Amino acid sequence: MNTLDFVDQASLREDVPDFRPGDTINVHVKVIEGSKERIQVFKGVVLRRSGGGVSATFTVRKESYGVGVERTFPVHSPNIDHIEILTRGAVRRAKLYYLRELRGKKAKIKEKR
């Protein structure tokens, strides 16, 4: 095993659920404000997953007061407390960038049965 692979293996998280683009998830993020630490929940639809290993990332999109907000998280980040899957989406694409232009009911994703 390569030394770099050994270091990467140590920083991988085991508690990451199996989620895909189209799923609606809650990402519980640790936020540090001054000396206090709290957990902030970011709820949205997974637009994409990219990369592999330690450098894997995913992007979540939500609408907040009529404005679209996208946030990209590293999958194995220590700043993520945990991820919970709310609904599974039935989509046929790996990257859901087309959701950026859609509004209202058209932006809804069918739930996988």
From Swiss-Prot:
Keyword vocabulary terms for this entry: Ribonucleoprotein, Ribosomal protein
Keyword field contains Ribosomal protein: yes
A GO CC term attached to the entry: cytosolic large ribosomal subunit
Spans traversing the lipid bilayer: none
GO process terms (BP): translation
UniProt keyword annotation of ATP-binding present: no
Database matches in InterPro entries: Ribosomal_bL19, Ribosomal_bL19_CS, Ribosomal_bL19_sf, Translation_prot_SH3-like_sf
GO MF, any single term: structural constituent of ribosome
Domain of life: Bacteria
Function recorded in the entry: This protein is located at the 30S-50S ribosomal subunit interface and may play a role in the structure and function of the aminoacyl-tRNA binding site.
PANTHER family tied to this protein: LARGE RIBOSOMAL SUBUNIT PROTEIN BL19M, RIBOSOMAL PROTEIN L19
Similarity remark: Belongs to the bacterial ribosomal protein bL19 family.
Name of the protein described by the UniProt record: Large ribosomal subunit protein bL19
Organism: Mycobacteroides abscessus (strain ATCC 19977 / DSM 44196 / CCUG 20993 / CIP 104536 / JCM 13569 / NCTC 13031 / TMC 1543 / L948)
Taxonomic lineage: Bacteria, Bacillati, Actinomycetota, Actinomycetes, Mycobacteriales
